[in-house]
Amino acid sequence: MFTWAMKKIFGTSHERAIRRMRPRVEAIGRMEPELQKLSDAQLRAKTAEFKEKLANGATLDDILVPAFAVCREASKRALKMRHYDVQLIGGMVLHNGCIAEMRTGEGKTLVATLPCYLNALEGKGVHVVTVNDYLARRDAEWMGKLYGFLGLSTGVVVNQQGDAEKRHAYRCDITYGQNNEFGFDYLRDNMKFSALEYAQRPLHYAIVDEVDSILIDEARTPLIISGQGERSSDKYRTINEVIPQLRNEEHYALDEKAHSVTLTDEGVETAERLLASLQVLKGTNLYDPVNLETLHILNQCLRAHTLYKRDVNYMVRDGKVLIIDEFTGRVLAGRRWSDGLHQAVEAKENVRIQEESRTMATITFQNLFRLYKKLSGMTGTADTEAAEFHSTYKLDCVIIPTNKPVVRKDYEDLVYKTEKEKFTAVINEILEKHELGQPILVGTTSVEKSTAISRILAKRGVKHNVLNAKHHENEAYVVAQAGRKGAITVSTNMAGRGTDIILGGNAEMLAKLKFKEQNRQPEAEPEAFEALVEEIKKECTAEGDEIREIGGLYILGTERHESRRIDNQLRGRAGRQGDPGTSKFYLSLEDDLMRIFAGDRVKNLMERMGMPDDEPIEHPWVTKSVENAQKKVEERNFDIRKNLLEYDDVMSAQRKTIYDMRQSLLVGRYSPEILDEEGKPTGEKRTIKPLASIVELVRPDVGYLLGMFANDPVMPLDADGNRREIVRKDFEKTERFVELENMQREIYTRWGVKIELETRADKVLEIYDECSELMPLALTEQRERLLDLMDRIIGAMVEESCPARKPPEDWDWGGIFQGFREHFSVELPDDIAHIGDQETLARELYERAEKAYEKREEEIGVELSLRIFRHLYLEELDKAWVDHLTDMDHLRDGIGLRGYGQKDPKQEYKKEGYNMFVNMVARVSSNVVTKLFSVNVRRAEQEEAQIEAADRERHAAALLDAVAQHDESLPLGANPAPARPQPAVMQEQECPCGSGKPFNKCHGGEDEATA
């Protein structure tokens, strides 16, 4: 009562949030007359003006009002669409890192342009995440006109793109793409062997369209990049023969509510007998460790037969089992169930069984999107999941008011006793509304149900369209016609999310359909296409007015979904932009949701009222009962997702550590934290200064590279010894520019250092100073990483062999001598055994190891030594990480059994997973150092040749990508710039690197040696 009164006085949290934004909306409106006076060029110049303000210290909030006003004005000119005031509010909500709940037809696609434009001004990239490739392409092409008008670039990432296309798309200011692609590209980047091959930039800001579908419905779906695993396909087919001989309740217990099935004692005995007859069982006990794989396959085959239904959970097409998304009704192309379940379903359906795979990299959507520095989303249905959005993603939901009041009528549910009676009533209702000319969208929960209704309508001779996983090719065209007079569309939940159903029909899509039927292209005949659109638009407008008179679009739901959101999405197809509409659900006690969760209560109510089978019950109590059942399912699913997230957080922390380590190796940087006395990180970074020897080694190369990659290279002949002055004088002689990209690539290929030269190509001295400072520092950091690795190995060796609790005479000196020899290929003198305390021993061992490494550097050189170190480290890390993923999967599979020992499985998983990870990292360090010190000079040269060959291959591929990308961007008739040969240098001339030495004593000598 008190809460109700407070809301009445102060408004809901949504209303208060919107009130706070109103002054900014009014300020944007006041700017409109002034902006209308600007020319297109003046309006475009505002983008550069905003960027300059940000560079001078302004925040995005400081420029929000003018930026939104400019975006609105540009939209009017480029798209012929003006943002409503409520859309401006939606844009502010998205910019603030919240979820904007907007009704269907309120223009979410256009709303996203406001925060996209504002945040893209930072130059760090904005990702707009959609649910499918079609929407990504459509929105990028459509909204790209607006961004291009304002001087920003737009990219789109979809499946089947090459590396060059992906890199180009991610370098754009705004990038559209499907959720899976962003995830897989993140994983692929973290499997690459060169930082120059990365597609993505650091994840900065994402706007997730249909955020509930991606962050809630698909939260449990892991993205997995797999490699080939062990072969066991024949075993699935053999064990599958056992399942049809097992009976429910007698041999197994099926719990549909918990989505689980378990063998009974009698079922285990029967299975053992049948498996033995098939010669699959080893011994007589199914639970013997030697039969663990057999037991696992048996359980998966049992699940496949009892819990997974054809044309509901999956469909079979072209001899393949394709998963159907339970929330959208779409086929999930390329997806496979993990843990052998997909193979079990393939065995059940008697199609070719694909080999089991091995996980190479994996991440869930929950953890992927939490990597972004800022995240926001939009959908028509988020408020029912507001608690989960806040607890998992720290995202608040704000309900945006509609531009026009919603006048759709939502009727109470009709509940029948049997499914047969329900479908009879559904068909009668469809025919009745069809005769009136009212368009009808029939919503079903599965391919099976939509096909059944379609068959009945076909028998009655009623023309209709079907939209499901089997008939999805012309989805956009089907949805375009769904609002036409008398149209009947039978659809699963996929009913065109992202595509509005317009009363009277979508004129543009209908024109495209007509062109398609005539094998014509709109792009080839733009004037004819526009004329056709205008002609059809008149027809659609007149038809739309007629439909409004008879009640608008009629939504007929044939079953309640487990989630209220999915039902609300179906209802939301009608009543867009103030149009009339109707929605009603027809249910039966045999529906899955009713049968499992609410059937008994409603059945008792119907029996008490003495209602016949063919008469439905329609009452608010029944609707409330169904909603309560849905709430129970939603709460259960939330608990499942929350539990899975807690497990996945363990892997997430480990993944982040490995990927950060891998990335720092690839870019050639290392900045470790300072540790306290207990060995815990303090949060402060250790300061590493470049070694003088490395400075002297590297700096001559900077001048050499500048001469090599200048657009008009000449040889600096000054001999005053000041390299910087030599560079300055040489590049002052004429206006020259440096080919930064090629110079960066050369530095990376040779030294393994990725340097971002953000200065302009004509600022040669700044480039020289930056490279002269960063290259020696990065190489010193790489060397420091190796020394730290050696230090940790020695520390672990001393800790294990010489524990503080034992006197020195009881220490394992044999372990110390052997361990040092194995790791550093050096024999220790006998007098080491006279040292009596751990600290002194560790210091002595470290000094000897460091001297051994310095000797190794003298033999093979600093550059080659560090290149081999990086190569070995990446190789060992990747191999160990893949093995670790498999080990963690096995740990996860069996951890539930710890509960029988009165232990918390979750805590045990965290503890054991951490120990496994620490041991894995230590093992990698040990292997890397051992291999590095065992490399002799001859083998080092072979290693270098292999690394260089791999680098050249990647370099060539990158150049081919660059050429392909460059050629696409060349205007017609343009010629690419000619390649400039490097000028010949006489051996006695001064080396162009600026060292002051003769060429034949410096880099000329190197060329001779490698020729």
Swiss-Prot record:
Cofactor requirement: Zn(2+)
GO MF annotation terms: ATP binding; metal ion binding; protein-exporting ATPase activity
Query: Its catalytic activity?
Result: ATP + H2O + cellular proteinSide 1 = ADP + phosphate + cellular proteinSide 2
Q: Which gene encodes it?
A: secA
Instruction: Give the protein family.
Output: Belongs to the SecA family.
Q: Example GO biological process term?
A: protein targeting
Positions of the UniProt region annotated as Disordered: 969-1011
Give a Gene Ontology cellular component term annotated to this protein. Answer: cell envelope Sec protein transport complex
Give the co-factor note: May bind 1 zinc ion per subunit.
Xref: CDD domains: DEXDc_SecA, SF2_C_secA
Q: What Pfam families would the database entry show?
A: P-loop_SecA (PF21090), SecA_DEAD (PF07517), SecA_PP_bind (PF01043), SecA_SW (PF07516)
This enzyme's EC code(s): 7.4.2.8
What binding partners and quaternary form does the record give? Monomer and homodimer. Part of the essential Sec protein translocation apparatus which comprises SecA, SecYEG and auxiliary proteins SecDF-YajC and YidC.
Q: Which residues form the signal peptide?
A: none
**Reported function:** Part of the Sec protein translocase complex. Interacts with the SecYEG preprotein conducting channel. Has a central role in coupling the hydrolysis of ATP to the transfer of proteins into and across the cell membrane, serving as an ATP-driven molecular motor driving the stepwise translocation of polypeptide chains across the membrane.
List the PROSITE patterns.
SECA, SECA_MOTOR_DEAD
Identification of the protein by name: Protein translocase subunit SecA
Question: What are the UniProt keywords, alphabetically?
Answer: ATP-binding, Cell inner membrane, Cell membrane, Cytoplasm, Membrane, Metal-binding, Nucleotide-binding, Protein transport, Translocase, Translocation, Transport, Zinc
Q: Where does Zn(2+) bind?
A: 991, 993, 1002-1003
